[in-house]
C-alpha cells in the first residue's frame, strides 16, 4: 500500500536525539497559524468593512454573536502569541547557527515580513482611535520614497486620506495574506526537512537519530498544550492585556491620541524608526531592522556553527536580546529625553550586532 509507506516514513522520520525545547516553537507557530486562520474566518463572517460600521460590528461580535467574544479575544491574543513564538524561533536560529541553512532562513525572513504586514492590516480593522492613527502614521512613511512616494500613498489609501476605500482594501489584504503565509510555511517546512534540522551542539546529527514519533511528537504536543493554556488563561482573566485603551474609542480624525504607538510586537521596529530624526532615514532603518536578518547566513565567519561553545558571541547575543527589549520599552514612552538618547543608543547596538558578530567569529577562530 503506497499510503501505508507514506504513513510509516512520516512516523519514522529520523530526528537528532538532542534537539531541545527551543526546537518546539515551529510546531507552536503552526498551531498559532491554524488558530488564527480559523478564528479569523468566523470573525470575517460578522465583520463589516465600512468606516461607519466597523467599530460597531466588532462590538456586535463581542456582545451578540454566540461565542463571538471567544473568537475575537482568541484572535487578538493569538496574534501576540504568534509573535512571542516567532521572536523566540528567530532568536533560537541566530543562537544555534540555523541560518546556515540559507533557503530555510531566507524563506523564514520572507514569512516574518508578510506576517508583520498581515498583523498591521489586522490592527487597523476594528477602526478604533489607535487603529486609525497607527495606520495614518505608518502608511504616511511611504511618502518618504523619492518621486513615487505620494503616488504610492494615494494609491494605497484609495484617496487623499485614510477613508472607507483604505479600510476595504486593508480587510481584503488581511484576508488574503494568511493564505500566502500558509503557502510559504509549507515551502519553509519542505526546505527544512529536505536537509534536516540542526541541533544544540551544531554537530552532524546523523550518528545519533531517533524516530520523530513518539519522542518529539509528544514534546511538541506538550509545548502546544502549554501555549494554548496560557492563551486561554489570558483570554479568561485579562482579555484586554495587550489592548491599547485608546482603541476602545471609535476612530476620530479630528482628535489625535497623546501617544501614537502600534501593537507591542512592532514596538522594536517603531522605536528604531522614531530614534532617527529624518523621515527617509527612519523609514530605511525600520525596513532594515527586519531585512538585516537576511545578512546572517552570508556573514558567518566562525568555524563552529552554534554559539554553545562560543562565550564571547554568547555575550553579544544576549546584548542583542536586552537591546531588543530596551527598544520595545522606549517605544512605549513619549519622544523626550532621556528616552530619545536611550532609543538611539539601543538602535545603534541592535544594528552593530550584525557587524560585530562576523568580526568576533573570525577572532574566535584565532584563539
UniProtKB/Swiss-Prot annotation:
PROSITE patterns: CYTB_CTER (PS51003), CYTB_NTER (PS51002). One of its GO terms (molecular function) is ubiquinol-cytochrome-c reductase activity. GO terms for biological process: mitochondrial electron transport, ubiquinol to cytochrome c. Heme b b562 binds at residues 75, 174. Gene3D superfamilies: Cytochrome Bc1 Complex, Chain C (1.20.810.10). Binds 2 heme b groups non-covalently. A ubiquinone binds at residue 193. Its cofactor is heme b. Keywords: Electron transport, Heme, Iron, Membrane, Metal-binding, Mitochondrion, Mitochondrion inner membrane, Respiratory chain, Transmembrane, Transmembrane helix, Transport, Ubiquinone. It is found in: Mitochondrion inner membrane. Heme b b566 binds at residues 89, 188. It is a multi-pass membrane protein. The keyword Zinc-finger does not apply. GO terms for cellular component: mitochondrial inner membrane; respiratory chain complex III. InterPro entries: Cyt_b/b6_C, Cyt_b/b6_C_sf, Cyt_b/b6_N, Cytb/b6-like_sf, Cytochrome_b, Cytochrome_b_C_euk/bac, Cytochrome_b_N_euk/bac, Di-haem_cyt_TM. The chain crosses the membrane at residues 25-45, 69-90, 105-125, 170-190, 218-238, 280-300, 312-332, 339-358. The keyword Nucleotidyltransferase does not apply. Component of the ubiquinol-cytochrome c reductase complex (complex III or cytochrome b-c1 complex) that is part of the mitochondrial respiratory chain. The b-c1 complex mediates electron transfer from ubiquinol to cytochrome c. Contributes to the generation of a proton gradient across the mitochondrial membrane that is then used for ATP synthesis. Belongs to the cytochrome b family. The cytochrome bc1 complex contains 3 respiratory subunits (MT-CYB, CYC1 and UQCRFS1), 2 core proteins (UQCRC1 and UQCRC2) and probably 6 low-molecular weight proteins. Heme 1 (or BL or b562) is low-potential and absorbs at about 562 nm, and heme 2 (or BH or b566) is high-potential and absorbs at about 566 nm. This is Cytochrome b. The lineage of its organism: Eukaryota, Metazoa, Chordata, Craniata, Vertebrata. The gene is MT-CYB.
